[in-house]
Amino acid sequence: MAKKNKKISLNTIAFNKKARHVYFIEQTLEAGLSLEGWEVKSLRDSKVQIKESYVILRSNEIFLYGAHISPLKSVSTHVNSDPIRTRKLLLNRLEINRIKEKINQKGATIVALKLYWIRGMVKLEIGLAKGKKSYDKRQDNKLRDWQRDKQRTLKQINYRL
């Protein structure tokens, strides 16, 4: 008897919308996070902000800086809860080597894109990115405005019919 394919639900905790506006995302990877217990509890309440976070490669390990996980009020007082501590990303050695090659290119960086639950574990989607120029951002805004206007007119035409 064949096994049924289980649906994997991606429960998103936090987005970094600004990253896709500021950077061209060339490739995305899924990385695990090394967290403490109080951080997991805070993530269950979505008390996290990855808007100003960034990823750095240091001594063949990858770390997440600047992610703010607010501690819950019910966290015990004997635990030192630092909301902006550095968190290690869990990746294979092969993936780290690929990232290292990409980062050595001029203008390349790693950006945290999305934080989500998968099978009870917290995962971070990171993107290998290059910065956009201001004219690229203007072009994206024009395209987005045009798409919005197109949808609006189609909706009006369909409403009249």
From Swiss-Prot:
GO CC term, one of those recorded: cytosol
Tell me the organism's taxonomic lineage: Bacteria, Pseudomonadati, Pseudomonadota, Gammaproteobacteria, Candidatus Pseudothioglobaceae
**Has the keyword Transport been applied to this entry?**
no
Q: Spell out the PANTHER family in the cross-references.
A: SSRA-BINDING PROTEIN, TMRNA-BINDING COMPONENT OF TRANS-TRANSLATION TAGGING COMPLEX
Q: Please give the superkingdom of this protein's source.
A: Bacteria
User: Which Gene Ontology molecular function entries are recorded, alphabetically?
Assistant: RNA binding
Q: Where in the cell is it found?
A: Cytoplasm
A GO BP entry: trans-translation
Protein family (similarity comment): Belongs to the SmpB family.
Name listed for the protein in its UniProt record:
SsrA-binding protein
- Species of origin reads Vesicomyosocius okutanii subsp. Calyptogena okutanii (strain HA)
- Keyword entries, A-Z: Cytoplasm, RNA-binding
Q: Enumerate the InterPro entries for this protein.
A: SmpB, SsrA-bd_prot, SsrA-bd_prot_CS
The protein's job, in short, is: Required for rescue of stalled ribosomes mediated by trans-translation. Binds to transfer-messenger RNA (tmRNA), required for stable association of tmRNA with ribosomes. tmRNA and SmpB together mimic tRNA shape, replacing the anticodon stem-loop with SmpB. tmRNA is encoded by the ssrA gene; the 2 termini fold to resemble tRNA(Ala) and it encodes a 'tag peptide', a short internal open reading frame. During trans-translation Ala-aminoacylated tmRNA acts like a tRNA, entering the A-site of stalled ribosomes, displacing the stalled mRNA.
Q: Which Pfam families match?
A: SmpB
